[in-house]
Amino acid sequence: MADGNEDARAEDLPGPAFENYEAMELACPAERSGHVAVSDGRHMFVWGGYKSNQVRGLYDFYLPREELWIYNMETGRWKKINTEGDVPPSMSGSCAVCVDRVLYLFGGHHSRGNTNKFYMLDSRSADRGLQWERIDCQGIPPSSKDKLGVWVYKNKLIFFGGYGYLPEDKVLGTFEFDETSFWNSSHPRGWNDHVHILDTETFAWSQPITTGKAPSPRAAHACATVGNKGFVFGGRYRDARMNDLHYLNLDTWEWNELIPQGVCPVGRSWHSLTPVSSDHLFLFGGFTTEKQPLSDAWTYCISKNEWIQFNHPYVEKPRLWHTACASDEGEVIVFGGCANNLLVHHRAAHSNEVLIFSVQPKSLVRLSLEAVICFKEMLANSWSCLPKHLLHSVNQRFGSNNTSGS
């Protein structure tokens, strides 16, 4: 489950038995790292990942594959749904997106190794039960891998990089073996800089012929799409965790490296990079070459080509291998991840906390709702005057749990 192949990894341990996973129903997801989270703007969907075993001590194990957790970004409430159908195996390091409320899931690492299987789930049928569907795509797929990135553009999912097995077929791009993976595995792995396209209308794989100087192979990097540009920042390659910034023109397939002005974030892997406007990206957390977890946040201004450090109240809450999703209200919702060095042999500090970053001004409706809640005792007798949908939001918020807001 590491961003390369170092120390003891949970992926090398026996698969868990899930029948005694939780004796009590949880009001929120279990703590985890290496999960996926995607958003439709109002809801965040969380699946997969792994956590520490409370019984067997140092052992980590994958979380139940049937569980999909849905977080209401307006009310701060969680809901668990047990999915059915072609349910993916329990995994970490998968790659996921949400397009028109359809969840797409590719790759990852499970108890038997890496995979290159592709799944989809239509969240619009949540009231009738959610069904996973495994898609047998046409064309030559990417190699089996995890810790890769993805951009969404028009009807295409564009995947980049990752850590996994040598491709079985001839592909465009570079693959570099991780020499340490030969020591403890019969299936050595490595990093790559491959770009693969999946057309969501035909479900056919293809590879573009890119121009320009491509980034080095890497894994545990972060990708974000703004317009026709696919940005990638950082990630791990061999012993280095990098802080380089590139974008791929998703119309012309030309790579460009960006050299920002002024101070830049330190090199890192296992961080998040989230589009928050047509001109800004939001960076949070990660893990340095010196194996230090990070709690810093930055905004990158595309038009000015500069990084600006973002002040926030979570400086004592470092996170790595977490997830981050943007809401329609100008917030970035960070969930889960690890607060310490998960590569060492003592227990990893996995989290199930929600951190909320306000990166855009709040709407008047949002400010009004927060005022109503803040002065609830004074205004409670007037709640009946609220429109039904606003009254519902107010009532829901009083049941919120496990959130922190800026």
From Swiss-Prot:
Compartments, as annotated in UniProt: Nucleus
Sequence ranges of the Kelch repeats: 31-85, 92-136, 148-207, 221-259, 271-311, 322-359
Xref: InterPro entries: Gal_Oxase/kelch_b-propeller, Kelch-typ_b-propeller
Domain of life of the organism encoding this protein: Eukaryota
GO cellular component, one term: Cul2-RING ubiquitin ligase complex
Main location: nucleus
Function: Substrate-recognition component of a Cul2-RING (CRL2) E3 ubiquitin-protein ligase complex of the DesCEND (destruction via C-end degrons) pathway, which recognizes a C-degron located at the extreme C terminus of target proteins, leading to their ubiquitination and degradation. The C-degron recognized by the DesCEND pathway is usually a motif of less than ten residues and can be present in full-length proteins, truncated proteins or proteolytically cleaved forms.
Keywords: Kelch repeat, Nucleus, Repeat, Ubl conjugation, Ubl conjugation pathway
Record-given protein name: Kelch domain-containing protein 2
Molecular function GO labels: ubiquitin-like ligase-substrate adaptor activity
PTM comment, free text: Autoubiquitinated by the CRL2(KLHDC2) E3 ligase complex.
Pathway: Protein modification; protein ubiquitination
Subunit-level organization: Component of a CRL2(KLHDC2) E3 ubiquitin-protein ligase complex, also named ECS(KLHDC2) complex, composed of CUL2, Elongin BC (ELOB and ELOC), RBX1 and substrate-specific adapter KLHDC2. May form oligomers as a KLHDC2-ELOB-ELOC complex; this interaction is autoinhibitory for the E3 ligase complex as the substrate-binding site of KLHDC2 is blocked in the oligomer. Interacts with CREB3; interaction is direct and specific as it does not interact with CREB1, ATF4, ATF6, JUN, FOS, CEBPA or herpes simplex virus transactivator VP16.
A Gene Ontology BP annotation from the UniProt entry: proteasome-mediated ubiquitin-dependent protein catabolic process
SUPFAM superfamilies associated with the record: Galactose oxidase, central domain (SSF50965), Kelch motif (SSF117281)
Transmembrane segments: none
Pfam family, one: Kelch_KLHDC2_KLHL20_DRC7
